[in-house]
């Protein structure tokens, strides 16, 4: 009995002296070591991977997709220059608008004058043959030649619808026409294309060779007339007889005519 007790004590002492031989304790130690190793390995791997991928991905991606653009700010002087240029362009545009309106107005006036000329041309064309025939029959001309001069006596008989500039041209009849025997300023149409004064109704000095258009107002000034003088003392007022005195009295403009009523 005593020997058995001593043997048991020896076994207990051996177990205490060598704890690693305990299977339960050794198993627990192995599990703790494996847990430490796996924690350190996973922490380092995830930290390095996430750091490298997130750093490289964000750096490279942002650099390639969003390049920096340099913006040069405008100075005050440059802004003032742009503003002045814009004002000049606006002023030029206003001038062009005014010029366009002026051209439209002039074209409207020219169209009206052309229509009036067309009407007058139709009337003259219709009556020209009648007038010529009447003139041949009614005019009793007596010519007295003295050297190079020729005297034409007025007709003594009246021919209906014959062209006249005064009652003397109708014999015993009357020359009907409110403006007959006066200078016709309407023959000069302002702005009408011309190469010479004949296109401006014969008004001497009316054709502007620079613009190639009729400038009737300037022609009045050339003959020492203001617009007031022209409209009150010259146009449809100055006397003429449809002959050579048109050049002197009417400055080349034609003479208004009427028709004889017998």
From Swiss-Prot:
User: Which interval of the chain is the signal sequence?
Assistant: 1-17
Positions the record marks as coiled coil are none
Source species of the chain? Caenorhabditis briggsae
Q: Where is the composition biased (Low complexity)?
A: 39-53
Q: Which PANTHER family match?
A: CHONDROITIN PROTEOGLYCAN 3, CHONDROITIN PROTEOGLYCAN 3-RELATED
Task: Report the glycosylation sites.
Answer: 140, 148, 224
What's the gene?
cpg-3
Q: Which domain of life is it from?
A: Eukaryota
InterPro entries cross-referenced by the UniProt entry: Cpg-3 (IPR039260)
Please give the residue ranges the record annotates as the region Disordered: 37-68
Put simply, this protein is called Chondroitin proteoglycan 3
UniProt keywords, alphabetically: Glycoprotein, Proteoglycan, Signal
């Amino acid at each position: 009995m005593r020997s058995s007790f001593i043997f048991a004590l020896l076994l207990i002492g051996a177990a205490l002296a060598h704890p690693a031989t305990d299977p339960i304790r050794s198993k627990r130690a192995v599990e703790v070591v494996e847990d430490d190793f796996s924690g350190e390995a996973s922490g380092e791997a995830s930290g390095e991977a996430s750091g490298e991928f997130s750093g490289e991905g964000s750096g490279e991606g942002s650099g390639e997709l969003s390049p920096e653009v340099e913006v040069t700010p405008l100075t005050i002087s440059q802004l003032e220059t742009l503003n002045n240029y814009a004002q000049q362009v606006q002023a030029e545009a206003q001038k062009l608008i005014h010029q366009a309106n002026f051209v439209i107005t002039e074209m409207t006036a020219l169209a009206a004058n052309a229509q009036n000329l067309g009407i007058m041309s139709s009337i003259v064309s219709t009556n020209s043959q009648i007038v010529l025939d009447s003139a041949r029959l009614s005019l009793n001309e007596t010519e007295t030649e003295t050297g190079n001069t020729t005297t034409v006596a007025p007709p003594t008989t009246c021919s209906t619808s014959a062209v006249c500039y005064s009652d003397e041209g109708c014999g015993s009849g009357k020359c009907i026409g409110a403006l007959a025997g006066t200078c016709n300023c309407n023959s000069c149409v302002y702005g009408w294309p011309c190469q010479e004064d004949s296109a401006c109704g014969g008004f001497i000095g009316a054709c502007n060779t620079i613009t190639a258009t009729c400038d009737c107002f300037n022609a009045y000034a050339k003959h020492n007339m203001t617009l007031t003088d022209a409209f009150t003392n010259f146009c449809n007022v100055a006397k003429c007889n449809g002959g050579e005195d048109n050049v002197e009295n009417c400055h080349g403009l034609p003479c208004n005519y009427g028709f004889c009523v017998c």
